[in-house]
Amino acid sequence: MHQIYSCSDENIEVFTTVIPSKVTSPARRRVKSSQHLLTKNVVIESDLYAPRPVELLPHRTDRRDGEGRWSGRFQNPRLQGPHPAKTPARPVGTSEPKSANLCGNRTYGKALMPPVARISVKAPTVLEAAAPGSENVAVLTRGSRHLKKMTEEFPTLPQGAEASLPLTGSAPCGMPSILRKMWTRHKKKSEYVGATNSAFEAD
């Protein structure tokens, strides 16, 4: 049976549909066949301000114009993945799990918003953990306020590793942690005013 989660307030509204993997519907086949087209990298805002140079890399089909001039595209060396060309600023949509043991044997289906197949968040590798006796404080070897802010907001991110964070979850897993953080943060600021459609609640 389909499971639909909704999470909304005055700024953002997320609808997520979860389809079991045993169902062989045409929608599931379309998701599976177009999986390679939906792969995108989503970066945390601090990665955009990281102190790394932006390099000009040539396309495969680019031709050389004159001596030493290439018509190419800009690419940040930090963003390396299957499709590093587009990076949406706000990660909203569904995600494909890396393995079947993520939340049982489930495959995530299409949502009502444009889907994002995988959301990869790279934790900064320039962080060093403080002594175990002190508080949970991260020391920056390179001074960057954005990296420090990111570690304060997301203390559970693994350091120096790539974490694949799915935005959907099944019934045993409960609501995903990122959506829960967004939901509780906005709920604390202002009370939600409006009607809730019970058709979009979890079954």
Swiss-Prot record:
GO CC terms of this entry: nucleus; plasma membrane
Assigned keywords, A-Z: Cell membrane, Membrane, Neurogenesis, Nucleus
Region annotated Disordered, chain positions: 59-101
Compositional bias per record (Basic and acidic residues), positions renumbered to this chain: 59-70
GO biological process, one term: neuron differentiation
Domain of life the protein comes from: Eukaryota
A Pfam family it matches: Vexin
Subcellular location(s) of the protein: Cell membrane; Nucleus
General function of this protein: Required for neurogenesis in the neural plate and retina. Strongly cooperates with neural bHLH factors to promote neurogenesis.
Similarity comment: Belongs to the vexin family.
Descriptive protein name: Vexin
Organism annotation: Bos taurus
Lineage: Eukaryota, Metazoa, Chordata, Craniata, Vertebrata
Name of the encoding gene: VXN
